[in-house]
Amino acid sequence: MKRYTVKDIEALLPKLGADDPRWEMLRQDERKSVQALLARFERQKARRHAIEQRWEELMRYERELYAAGVRRIAGIDEAGRGPLAGPVVAAAVILPKDAYLPGLDDSKRLTPEKREALFAQIEACAVAIGIGIVSAAEIDERNIYEATRQAMAKAVNALSPPPEHLLVDAMAVPCPLPQQRLIKGDANSASIAAASVIAKVTRDRWMKELDRRYPQYGFARHMGYGTPEHFEAIRRYGVTPEHRRSFAPVREVLKASEQL
């Protein structure tokens, strides 16, 4: 095996079957560079296997529905229930039966860069994507729970072709379609995880646009959540039309400044 260079071995490794006798010869190679190469290859292989296993776990509910004859399954999730400013955004995503999105997970577990990359991949492969947006003013008129349900219904109604079944993260969508409510659905269903990415990226982009309109509030940094920076900006500059006046922290600041 010494006649092979490290570069030769690096090219050979992906081609070796599990039972290839050359594995044992490589493991007995005394060169440190070869052993380091083997260790790196095994780590990469283990990571790929973990990603594949994770995908199979995420597809469990979808595969059960496919086996029952359901063809178009929409995952539903939202972003922006907790912030003090900006809309609540819901997304509905129908993935193809043969979809494979390695690295997909609950959007909260992903970096902004990974979310953006997955957003593009989901857009490229999805059968349909629907988005529903409910403004801060509408949230104040209803309440955040009902506003979120309305955003989800809008997202479902925007799907073309329409879904046959819904997988929803915890909530019930006000529509007549059959649906399953999954606790922590964005961590347990590929369709819901895809919807969580679409909803999160869509809302983040919206908040970055608001940051250009209201640069003094720092929306691009905190996305409307109640950070010390955000509270200080509200106290100093007041509230914008994008703030949720029905939310207690905003209401308290308004009372203190006699704006309510």
From Swiss-Prot:
PANTHER family: RIBONUCLEASE H2 SUBUNIT A, RIBONUCLEASE HII. It catalyses: Endonucleolytic cleavage to 5'-phosphomonoester. This is Ribonuclease HII. PROSITE patterns: RNASE_H_2 (PS51975). It is an enzyme of class 3 (hydrolase). Its EC number is 3.1.26.4. It is found in: Cytoplasm. Manganese or magnesium. Binds 1 divalent metal ion per monomer in the absence of substrate. May bind a second metal ion after substrate binding. Gene3D superfamilies: Ribonuclease H-like superfamily/Ribonuclease H.
